[in-house]
Design a protein with these regions (language model features):
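Non-catalytic cap/lid and distal C-terminal segments of serine-dependent acyl enzymes
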Residues: 1, 63, 86-87
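Short secondary-structure junction motifs
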Residues: 41-44, 56, 71, 121, ...
């Protein structure tokens, strides 16, 4: 949310991420969980809700391991997600270090590790020269198998609590696969 090279030089631990807004919300949820009984609430039945940017915050909390156990249901109204550059979507930097654990790198490694590793390494070695080859490889993947692989990874990551986010139009009630 707020990052500046000057902050990064002195930041440690979680502050190094510069996700101060998300970290503040997580701290607030710790407080809620600790104190909710004083207000007649149940610390084992906490629902979070957000609209627009708040909906985005809900989705961010769902993706953050630091928020595990702090809430039990989530509602994201008009929340949004961000798109990634090609490098971010692949999920690794030029040194092969993971920068996006749910990027296409994780999914494609699950899908077909050996052939994907070869094409990914060629792309990372020279993105301009090998972009067409990488894109051709991605277009050759069977969509059904790829979505099944994505679903396996997503089930491990995101389906830990009930989430209200669909409207039946933007995301069909049958899920994203039904729209393809």
């Amino acid at each position: 949310w707020f990052t500046h090279p000057g902050i990064q030089d002195f930041a440690t631990g979680m502050d190094k991420s510069s996700n101060f807004g998300t970290l503040d919300i997580i701290e607030a949820l710790h407080w809620v969980k600790k104190n909710i009984r004083s207000f007649g609430g149940n610390p084992e039945n906490i629902t979070i809700f957000g609209e627009s940017a708040g909906g985005h915050n809900v989705l961010t909390l769902l993706a953050s391991p630091a928020s595990n156990g702090l809430f039990h249901k989530a509602i994201s109204q008009s929340g949004y997600t961000s798109s990634f550059t090609t490098i971010e979507a692949i999920g690794v930097d030029s040194n092969g270090k993971t920068i996006n654990s749910l990027g296409s790198d994780s999914i494609l490694n699950e899908y077909n590790a050996s052939s994907y590793q070869n094409i990914k390494n060629a792309y990372l070695e020279n993105p301009k020269k090998n972009a067409d080859q990488y894109q051709k490889y991605l277009r050759s993947i069977d969509g059904k198998e790829l979505f099944e692989t994505y679903k396996l990874i997503a089930d491990k990551t995101f389906h830990r609590i009930p989430l209200a986010t669909r409207d039946g139009v933007v995301i069909p009630l049958q899920g994203i696969q039904a729209s393809l």
